[in-house]
Amino acid sequence: MFEKVVIANRGEIALRVARACRELGIKSVALYSTCDAESAVVKFADEAVHVGPNHPGKSYLHIPNVIGAALKTGADALHPGYGFLSEDPFFAEICANNGITFIGPKPEVMEKVGDKAIARDLMQKAGLPLLPGTVEPVGTADEALEIGASIGYPVIIKAVAGGGGRGMNVVRREEDMARLYQTTRATAQAVFKDSAVYIERYLDAPRHTEIQLVCDSHGNGVYFFERDCSVQRRHQKLIEEAPSIHLSDEQRRDIGERAVRGALSVGYTGAGTMEFLLDHDGNLSFMEMNARIQVEHPVSEMITSVDLIQEQIRVAAGEPLSVSQDDVKLRGHAMECRVNAEDPDRDFAPAAGKLDVYVPPGGPWTRVDSHCYPGWSIAPFYDSLIAKLIVWAPTRPEAIERMDRALSEFQISGRGVKTTIPFHRRVLADERFRSGDVSTDFVEHFLAGEAAKVA
């Protein structure tokens, strides 16, 4: 097992990793930018190192500073969290070259699954279902037109290196294909420094379903069931829950086993997520793989009672998984609301500031993952996440009621600070959400309905 882990991240995930390290008897090193000097993880970790000014490109994304901090403190491993450098194969390789174990997949594996066209090809060969489309980059506008005619409109053009909802365009008519093909390539080059794109059939209003898995270096892989992440706005998730109420036990087992086989077939090690689209006929189609822990991992932990961060650390240290597939049981229903410093009444505009009041909720089966405290200033340089509020209950209706109760207790205020709590409570009261009739267009229609009522 590792002796010391440097945490190349900030906010709630950095604190989450530091806590896992302490429970495993591992010393932790927090990295912090200038404005994060008083952050909760800096106070909690065994050591802390300043890595640069507030701009992430000069601190959390500045590889020489991050590696320098790891070497300076004698850390033998590095946990990247999510975001920042967590899916950068170049960074993972630099860690390895400096004798630091990157807690995640090997660089060459990360590169394979990070290229969405290559990942589609590999997962198709491993037996995962795919939407009709290409498994190789589309080289010309003429080729794009041929593909559109072959699979039928609408289609979606995606950057092979894309992520976070960027680098994609939906094409509904043949006459728009050439223009949107060139637009997507230009965006991909500007944002991801890679102009390659692929094309697949576009599903209107599918459900977003993802499988959580962990694989070790001994050929073992375990899936921790699925999450439904359909409540999202502009491809940014707002509410996640587990399990999906739209999968049968047979589907759940089948897609979980296929996801693990797919991951093992490419030599994957560590925690990862297979993302799928679920159509209204119950068909699942592989979309992409995320080679890291995800923001919403707590809901999977709540329904399985397995600490996924600790599993990540164990397998990176060369240990086998601490659980087998037979050990992992699905119990009850969990839900997570992302409490962000945003104003839902102003198109989710940033609403950061100093927290004068911060009182998280309590009660049975109620969990708050947060780095915030009274007096903490939410910096405008990073994401707007204040806290992840997670609840568990025996059934989904009970989980909804528990979440609403917990949200009603959550006290957050400060000059200029607004949160998404009122939005979440309105969603929880919506009959469509309560019935589970939710797809990726839910928030768009929900907000339009609210606007119509005001008008």
Describe these PLM feature segments:
Residues G57-K58, M110, G167, H297-V299:
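A generic structural signal for short coil/turn motifs at secondary-structure boundaries
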Residues A159:
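N-terminal nucleotide-binding beta1-loop-alpha1 segment
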Residues M1-K125, V138-E146:
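ATP-binding N-terminal substructure of ATP-dependent carboxylate-amine bond-forming enzymes
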Residues E146-I156:
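Acidic/histidine-enriched active-site and ligand-binding environments that engage anionic O-linkages
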Residues V6-S28, A48, L71-T73, P89-F91, ...:
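ATP-dependent carboxylate activation and anion-phosphoryl transfer catalytic cores
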